[in-house]
Amino acid sequence: MDFVEEFTDEERLKIEQDFSRLADKCYLDHAGTALYGESQLRAVQELLAGGLYCNPHTSRTMEDLIDLVRYRVLRWFQTRPADYSLVFTSGTTASLKLVAESFEFGPGDAEPGSFVYLRDSHTSVLGMRELVRTGRVQPIERAELLQALNEPEDPRRQHPHRPSLLVFPAQCNFNGAKYPLELCELIERNGLRGYGGDAFHVCLDAASHVSTSPLDLSRYRPSFVCLSFYKIFGYPTGLGALLVRRDAEPLLRGKRYYGGGTVKIALSGPDRFHERRDALPDRLEDGTINFLSIAALLPCLETLTRLIPGPTMDRIQRHTFQLARHCYRELQALQHANGGRVVDLYHDTAFGDARTQGAIVNFNVLNDDGGHVGFAEVACMAANHGIYLRTGCFCNPGACQRHLRLADDDLLRHYRAGHVCGDANDLIDGQPTGSVRVSFGYCTRRSDVDRLVAMVRRCYVRRSLTGPLSRADVLAQYKSYDRPRLVQLCLYPVKSCGPLRVTTGGWPLAPTGLLYDRAFLIVDEHGAAMTQKKLPTMCRIRPDIADGRLVLRHADLEDEPLTIGLEGGGEAGEPAAAHLCQTKVCRDSVQGVDCGERAADWVSRALGVSGLRLLRQSGQEPRRQRQTDRALSLNNQAQLLLINRTSVRWLRDKVGDGDWDGADAPSLDALVDRFRGNLIVETVRPLEESDWRQVLIGPSQFTVDGPCTRCQMICIDQATGERTAEPLRTISREFGGRMRFGVYLSLAGDWADRELPLGATVSGVIEESE
């Protein structure tokens, strides 16, 4: 079936105008969060600016407004206050936790009911196991759950008497598979096989489902529904709901803690007497609820229905499903020259029906030999193409484990090998630890899907049957030159800006590596560190050091160089302000000294971004390398980065001349610049630095901390700031998905009064494995 546009031209135009910030960006993580529209924020601002909204414990007007929002939200889900109560929470996780700590599994003197959860559930559901007050806790497989659809009602089934709880998602957040909502009624009426005495109540995790699909609670009536509003509207965050069917309210009596506003009376004496309020929301909404965000839901609901009139969520479902199906089929059709698949798709449906499949596509990329490309590399390539997507296991270990065919022992082995949730350790022994997820929303365009598919095709489809050379072939084809030497020294006084190349003599060492390397950084108006990942044109700021001062130049400000004292704070001629600022570099909190207003104005004009500040690293809180406790400046991982020109030459030969996105292949020097190394050496053979464990450069000794894992920074032309797909693509291909090039070094021994001389001989020490 061909792609059919759901929205009219006028509707598409309005949506594009409301999301003008997506003009050159491709956002494909709507399952992570929806995006808010510009008119939506304006409407929220007008609402808040146009009224006096007090604490609801103070103002009856605010109470009435909150009740109106409850009614509107219930109506959004096709139900009414007579059938469901709505309890505001901080999100789906808080709603699930509230059910877990409140659900009564039976009187204390009787055998408790069961807590059963689908294995393909979000981590927040797994966490419920630690709170429920029953020892009868069991997972259920997908096939077992679906079996309840065909389970006939057993007239001989004994009358169930143990209150029990089943939790499953309306839609799997891993791959968008939808579960039949008829299960809610069937299981509450007929129970589950093997649980004869259990009277089940269904808790439906609707967070993923309601983001792009309608939920009709007049037709499907689970006991409990958990959701988050940012999944639907993008804003507000930190606000969710627990919807409780009226006849299930008595089951939520187990919660012991009570907060302000939830009791009729509470005595402060030793007998701890208190009486909870009657209405369920009044009993469970501890303290002051997020009343301004609750009020903001009104313009959020109105904006979405204005942009997409008619049955809004039905139309969004049709639009996003078509996008997902188009993406699925396009990826499925990709082939390597040898006929091999380019992607592994992890799905339970073939995208035949929007009632069984949501707007999520999950996959991993395959090399032409069938081996997997790591998801971290795909994420880097996507970022290099302006594509926002999600990688990992998406807080759904059960679905991830099932689709990647990983046993529990595999997961434990990966954990012992250093892999944890959210890291970039994407392949262990060639086995993927996660996958790539793309998901779609109402503001997603078909061109966004085509952009993703084009990226995968360009970066990963091998069109030639010629394979890469083996390591032995590489070494055999490269002849010896001279003895390895240090041919260039580079330092980067301002993090992520251009290099200062040392052309004569040498350069002094410091406790953190090269003296003044990454001593300064630029932060945005919120204090977040700026890098070329965010602003590639930072490479056009060129530094120099003379007479104890840092001089910054930019081609657009050629007649206005900026001069900064290396040890002080401000520009030459401006008093140094002792204004300390906090920022983060690679998850480390870093203290910096603000270099003053003139410096801030200069970097803002040079980079064309308002509100930037220039900071110098403060010596009051020295930064330390996590593994070794060695002193660090503002560099990312280690004190020094060594790059081998011979290896870069080998890499350049591996990249085809036509693979530079229409541009001429860069010179060797220009390609070396992309790796932003400190110590540029030239050895006899390419890649031999990968085997070194220690390095001697002249009289100075260094310890190898490990290989440098590359990111999309090496795809930025350091002369222009333009991006290309290479050389990251070739590095991944040649090294089996491992994006490593160059090695990190740290100072060993005494560094005092040492200087690294250009032209010094380089000796790598190899420790043979036993």
Curated annotation (Swiss-Prot):
A Pfam family of this chain: MOSC
Keyword Transferase annotated: yes
Ranges where the MOSC domain occurs: 601-770
Catalytic activity: Mo-molybdopterin + L-cysteine + AH2 = thio-Mo-molybdopterin + L-alanine + A + H2O
Biological processes annotated in GO: Mo-molybdopterin cofactor biosynthetic process; molybdopterin cofactor metabolic process
Catalytic residues as annotated in Swiss-Prot or TrEMBL: C395
Lineage: superkingdom: Eukaryota
Cofactor names: pyridoxal 5'-phosphate
GO molecular function terms noted in the UniProt entry: lyase activity; molybdenum cofactor sulfurtransferase activity; molybdenum ion binding; pyridoxal phosphate binding
Modified residues (N6-(pyridoxal phosphate)lysine): K231
UniProt-listed Enzyme Commission number(s): 2.8.1.9
Top-level class of the enzyme under EC nomenclature: transferase
Recorded family membership: Belongs to the class-V pyridoxal-phosphate-dependent aminotransferase family. MOCOS subfamily.
HAMAP family assigned: MOCOS (MF_03050)
Function, as annotated: Sulfurates the molybdenum cofactor. Sulfation of molybdenum is essential for xanthine dehydrogenase (XDH) and aldehyde oxidase (ADO) enzymes in which molybdenum cofactor is liganded by 1 oxygen and 1 sulfur atom in active form.
Name of the featured protein: Molybdenum cofactor sulfurase
Organism per entry: Anopheles gambiae (African malaria mosquito)
